[in-house]
């Protein structure tokens, strides 16, 4: 291989010959297939001084497939240079002359030859003089967006080949498969060409079927607003290369357009992305780079071209963010728990409600992660300011950072206070209800007393009455009070029998108690007796509160000895009817069961019953001896 200067000198000789042939319009069969590319290289050389090595393949490479040629060229040409070529006046002509060679393989190697049509085919496919003069077939088109197709109408005349393509710098690139087909249409007919995306660089190209014919190309969609809509952004492939503190997005375009990109943040997927000031990304060969950024899913790129824009948010592939923060509230302080996998400095401050929820107010609290890529948990303690304020958290070691707004949840504190208040109120209401129940409903709120009335005039009878009172108090249980004058002798002696009886009667009536009248017909007649206590008791029997129960000992009084007015009262024979008497005195079944089932209670009741039985025998014997000396009269024992 020679030096570059020698190669350039040798290759400049064919260029000189081609230029002379073209200027002199000398037909050169061996150079005819190079004509279009030589002119192209010549124009490029006029616009850009010098001819680089990357452009020499254009002079000798002749491919029938435009995508191959375009790929070959694009791999060797910067994108900025392609855009300049696209805007060149020499490349924006509506039509240019092409040569379609056919390859033939012989023993001498590969060479190109021109296929000559027969006379009939020549007359059929030969374009008219007017068409040749106009430079290719005239055609019209209609856009069918509902079916994503372009309807092309060829005028009357020979057959033509039509296709859709995306105009790049030096070549009109075929559409991607299956939209990259060329269709043959007869003169005076129409054909529908489907497309994938309606783009501003999409062109319609038509040519006759002969060699060395002219292709007519129309690129009408550059001024159509529809070409910059959703199809335009869907045709772009966005690739995210963001890492560390750098947001990087690579774009693969189908049209050689230069987009503008800026940083924006989106609070919610349904809300617009708000552009941040002074946050324009730098573009280089399709790469958009923004330095010193806190990578966050809500920080996005906003690409715009003309009046159209599109938002592309990196980090949407499900990868975990580089840092997270959580909050824990205590008595008078707030604890922020940071988890970070990168070097970073985090700051936090209370928000200022007067200036806005995103405006921090001093002081600012900061903490740093200095251990690199190892996951580290940091705790930042902040004193409480006011419960209605929110805390702002952000990365302070970068220029562009998204502020997290965290509002302390103090509802659990309010809920706890509310629960305590409700409990206190419930307890207070319960106490009030209990007090009212005891006052207004004494039967259900407290134990009802039993007033035991008797007229015992002997020592044996008094002992029997006392034993019966002890038996009733033990059997009733639950703190039931049995009122009997024998147990309140001092009080009776101080105030007198009658006032004591009236006070006991009022208490029983107030507390809804029961009066138990113990009757006896033995012994001396109380009616004839001068005992003032017995006379007072007989006088008050008619005024005794209800319910009034009558009980009698079988050995001291017979059933027939009860006066007729008292026979209407419930009567209980002691000690045989003691269980019935206890039920009548409103002894609870549970109390009875627990009392009788308990071993100590059984022994106590058994002793009380035996004592009452013995005292009944003793009183009956004593009364029998006394009855021989005085006539029998009715008595309230």
From Swiss-Prot:
Residue numbers on the Extracellular membrane side: 24-414
Tissue: Predominantly expressed in mucosal tissues, including trachea, lung, kidney and stomach. Highly expressed in colon epithelial cells. Also expressed in testis. Low expression, if any, in heart, liver, spleen, or brain. Among CD4 T-helper cells, expressed at high levels in Th17 cells.
Region forming the signal peptide: 1-23
S-adenosyl-L-methionine keyword on record: no
Region ranges (Disordered): 87-134
Alphabetized PROSITE patterns for the sequence: SEFIR
Keyword Cell membrane: yes
SEFIR domain: residues covered: 447-583
Phenotype of null mutants: Mutant animals are born normally at the expected Mendelian frequency. They exhibit much lower expression of genes encoding antibacterial molecules, much greater bacterial burdens and total mortality after infection with Citrobacter rodentium.
MF terms (GO), sorted A to Z: interleukin-17 receptor activity
Keywords: Cell membrane, Cytoplasm, Glycoprotein, Inflammatory response, Membrane, Receptor, Secreted, Signal, Transmembrane, Transmembrane helix
Induction / repression: Up-regulated by its own ligand IL17C. Also up-regulated by IL6 and TNF acting synergically. This induction can be further increased by IL23.
One cellular-component annotation, GO: cytoplasm
Positions bearing carbohydrate: 278, 307
InterPro entries: IL-17_rcpt-like, IL-17_rcpt_C/E_N, SEFIR_dom
Transmembrane segments annotated in the record for this chain: 415-435
Pfam families in the cross-refs: IL17_R_N (PF15037), SEFIR (PF08357)
Biological process annotations from GO: inflammatory response
Spans within the Cytoplasmic topological domain: 436-637
Complex and partners: Forms heterodimers with IL17RA; the heterodimer binds IL17C.
Reported function: Specific functional receptor for IL17C, signaling through the NF-kappa-B and MAPK pathways. Requires TRAF3IP2 /ACT1 for signaling. Crucial regulator in innate immunity to bacterial pathogens, such as Citrobacter rodentium. Isoform 4 and isoform 5 may be either cytoplasmic inactive or dominant active forms. Isoform 2 and isoform 3 may act as soluble decoy receptors.
Stated name of the protein: Interleukin-17 receptor E
Organism in which the protein naturally occurs: Mus musculus (Mouse)
Gene name per UniProt: Il17re
